[in-house]
Amino acid sequence: MPIGDYELHKEIGKGAFSVVFLVTEKKTKKQWAMKIIDKKSSSKAALETEIEIMKKVDHPNIVKMHEYFESTDKIYLVVELVTGGPLFDRIVDKKSFTEKEAKLITQQLLQSLVYLHSIGIVHRDLKPENLLLKTPTDLTVALSDFGLSKIVGDDVFMKTTCGTPSYVAPEVLNNISNSPTAYSDAVDMWGVGVITYILLCGFPPFYSEDIRKLFESILSASYDFPNDYWGNVSKEAKHFINCLLTVEPTKRYSAKQALEHPWIIENNQTQPLPHWNDQIKKYMVIRRKESQKFGAELVWKPQAQTTNVKPTK
């Protein structure tokens, strides 16, 4: 189906290598989101993988693809329109935020990852910008952007260096300075830990304007729970994060294990998190400055192919 079958409206999103428009399908009058990707800015293999993944996935907490087509220099992905906007853009406007709300968001993310990992898909770029809300009125999450994702099998493990620095797992960073070592879907679980930490206090566990210091803190999992911001957060929540921000990937909780953690199953704390609103606003300013400063450098594109090797235990 050519682009002429759609009426383009306003731009609703922009990434390092793509632009997203609100569109209406002329025949059905239904609205969709159209992601337009410049072929010159992305590798052919990466684009093919993203399309293959989008065709394959079907889960209530993952943005669903309607169809795709291409021109000489562009790829067009027509996907489900989610109208709630990026998660953090929405919650930054809330006057208060509770541990229960953070749990419900994390739970939905975990459900999407249990599904993805069960069919051999690793997202590899979990960050707040890739978590969208389906409607403006609730906190139903939809995971998006599979541009760096990979399909893996039992005997295929990743060695490429990609992701977003503040959220990337230690084993991925190790591939920059050391001989590449294999890693698995555990990289996604580190991202869940970082996102959950931010949801509960409004700032990230790892941050430095000096990227070398940032990497050092990630590689050693140097983070804490400052009492001024974490004093009212449950011990179960802290334990949950500790189980995910574990340097050794084989000791890190899987998506299924995390979904069965007591914090996810039992937590119902509705007391507003202290200082949360001020901190999340400050963090959003920092994220925007990072994007302006680094631009595409915030995302590492794959620089090697997956390899048929077993991971080192």
From Swiss-Prot:
Domain of life according to the entry: Eukaryota
First-level EC class: transferase
InterPro entries: Kinase-like_dom_sf (IPR011009), Prot_kinase_dom (IPR000719), Protein_kinase_ATP_BS (IPR017441), Ser/Thr_kinase_AS (IPR008271)
SUPFAM superfamilies: Protein kinase-like (PK-like)
One family name in Pfam for this protein: Pkinase
Amino-acid positions noted as binding ATP in the UniProt annotation, renumbered to this chain: I12, G13, K14, G15, A16, F17, S18, V19, V20, K35
GO cellular component terms, semicolon-separated: cytoplasm
EC number(s) from the headed UniProt entry: 2.7.11.18
Gene3D superfamilies membership: Transferase(Phosphotransferase) domain 1
Keywords assigned by UniProt, alphabetized: ATP-binding, Kinase, Nucleotide-binding, Phosphoprotein, Serine/threonine-protein kinase, Transferase
Reaction(s) this enzyme catalyzes, per UniProt: L-seryl-[myosin light chain] + ATP = O-phospho-L-seryl-[myosin light chain] + ADP + H(+); L-threonyl-[myosin light chain] + ATP = O-phospho-L-threonyl-[myosin light chain] + ADP + H(+)
GO terms, molecular function: ATP binding; myosin light chain kinase activity; protein serine/threonine kinase activity
Function: May phosphorylate a specific serine in the N-terminus of a myosin light chain.
Protein name as annotated: Probable myosin light chain kinase DDB_G0292624
Organism: Dictyostelium discoideum (Social amoeba)
